[in-house]
Design a protein with these regions (language model features):
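Beta-rich carbohydrate-recognition and catalytic domains
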Residues: 2-48, 59-113, 117-165, 175-231, ...
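Beta-propeller and closely related beta-sheet repeat lectin domains
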Residues: 51-56, 110-115, 169-172, 237-240
Length: 290
């Protein structure tokens, strides 16, 4: 697991921890696996927030790509990209590539992740511009000059519950036979401070710009003391999930202070999405027979 950690002077770095069962992370080195290295993530305001935030990792072939939010305390937060060879990651030789910015200057852009496979021969990248989730396709991962992330909106707050202010992806989509399972966070202005909760959607396998199912009620919301309180209260904020056996493990930040895990049967979530959308699939037929 890659996770964001913050020092006493509010510098964000990325730590590493591993687990044999998905619950207990006893293997947790004291040194970070990734630290700020470039001017766009250096601390420009003493004591202010800066560094590398909210990493999302995607394995494609023998390479692990990491998209994260780079912030120096003055400029708008932007999406940065770095990568590492799978063998180096496994052996913890942190030979990360030099990071590059991939989102446009002077525009706040966050919550980005790569799909775990190319779509029609192109890299597919989800990111958040403004208050909505965008999808962009690119031929390669070379950015700069006049080439920046853009794309089109695929999900926006107007399609959520009435009090939703903004939303962003929780982590890379998970491929299922029914579609790409996308977990995403929503920010509700019903409370102060605002509440971050998690919802789920299903994207078309061949054309993920098509949202084929969307469960607008939360699958995870702040309930415990450590989710309701902390550096920022009323927050559950995942950056990744994994399927282990028949279960979906969702790893999230609680109250911007601790890391938790929530689990549920993948089949139950998929069935609720499909039922919510009124879709008739092999999965729903099987459930009906039972």
């Amino acid at each position: 697991m890659a996770y964001r950690a913050m020092s006493e002077d509010n510098t964000s770095v990325i730590g590493f921890a591993s687990s044999g069962d998905g619950y207990n992370f006893e293997d947790r080195p004291t040194e970070p696996m990734y630290t700020p290295r470039e001017a766009f993530e250096a601390k420009l305001v003493p004591g202010g927030n800066s560094g590398c935030e909210d990493p999302r990792l995607t394995k494609i072939g023998e390479t692990i790509y990491m998209l994260y939010t780079a912030f120096n305390g003055k400029s708008e937060p932007r999406v940065a990209l770095s990568y590492i060879k799978l063998d180096d990651f496994i052996t913890r030789c942190w030979n990360w590539s030099r990071p590059i910015l991939i989102s446009p200057p002077n525009v706040p852009d966050k919550d980005a992740a790569l799909f775990p496979k190319k779509i029609k021969g192109k890299y597919a990248i989800l990111h958040r511009l403004g208050v909505s989730i965008w999808l962009d396709y690119v031929d390669d991962l070379q950015f700069g000059g006049n080439k920046w992330l853009k794309g089109n909106v695929i999900m926006s707050p107007k399609d959520e519950l009435p009090d939703t202010e903004k939303l962003g992806i929780s982590g890379p989509p998970i491929e299922t036979r029914e579609g790409w399972l996308l977990l995403y966070h929503c920010v509700s202005r019903k409370t102060q401070p605002m509440t971050y909760y998690v919802a789920a959607a299903l994207l078309d396998l061949k054309d993920p710009s098509k949202v084929i199912a969307r469960r607008k009620v939360p699958i995870l919301e702040p309930e415990t003391y450590y989710e309701l309180n902390g550096q920022v209260g009323n927050v559950v904020f995942p950056c990744g999930a994994v399927v282990i056996g028949e279960d979906l493990f969702v790893y999230y930040g609680g109250g911007d202070t601790v890391i938790g895990v929530a689990t549920m049967k993948l089949s139950e979530l998929m069935n609720s999405l499909i039922t919510w959308a009124g879709l008739e699939t092999e999965l729903t037929k099987l459930v009906k027979k039972k």
